[in-house]
């Protein structure tokens, strides 16, 4: 259901895929790339799943429960940088100021935030704001980050 909804309204992503293809930066059919991308964005996960994904990133790419490396350590800072600068789409800058943590939102209302070297915070709430980010999940994570003093910017930076 999420896939169908996202795919039928993916006008912006469809345009980007076509531009990338036109510029020689997308090496497959733009519509097929859009289908694959949208399908990956529509995978259902729980708050526990998000928390474990974030904890794995906080642990340098090693799953903290299994001890198994699931991502090369050298890629973790790159991924966290992308999360910090683009994880909230148009609200990424505001998010970084308010929460001060790299994070990624999902269309289902999930958000995962990472405190590198320490832990992750995950939350789910379906009500989205105009930018497509969960209102309650954002507030919960901002409050937790402030209470723990883990944000790197804003009024509660340590």
Language-model segments: residues:
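Conserved active-site and cofactor/substrate-binding residues in soluble primary-metabolism enzymes
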Residues: 11, 15, 32, 45-48, ...
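Generic, ordered loop/turn and secondary-structure boundary motif
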Residues: 38-39, 44-46, 102
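Structured C-terminal helix/loop/strand segments within mature extracytoplasmic catalytic/sensor domains
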Residues: 56-158
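Active-site-adjacent helix/loop patches that line small-molecule binding or acyl-intermediate pockets
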Residues: 1-41
């Amino acid at each position: 259901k999420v896939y169908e909804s996202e795919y039928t309204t993916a006008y912006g992503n469809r345009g980007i895929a076509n531009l990338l293809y036109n510029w020689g930066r997308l090496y497959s059919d733009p519509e097929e790339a859009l289908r694959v991308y949208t399908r990956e964005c529509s995978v259902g996960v729980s708050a526990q799943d998000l928390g474990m994904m974030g904890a794995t990133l906080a642990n340098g790419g090693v799953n903290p429960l299994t001890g198994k490396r699931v991502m090369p350590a050298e890629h973790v800072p790159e991924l966290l940088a992308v999360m910090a600068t683009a994880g909230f789409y148009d609200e990424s800058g505001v998010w970084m100021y308010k929460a001060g943590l790299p994070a990624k939102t999902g269309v289902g209302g999930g958000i995962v935030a990472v405190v590198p070297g320490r832990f992750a915070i995950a939350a789910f709430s379906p009500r989205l704001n105009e930018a497509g980010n969960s209102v309650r999940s954002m507030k919960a994570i901002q409050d937790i980050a402030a209470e723990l003093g883990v944000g790197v910017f804003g009024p509660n930076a340590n």
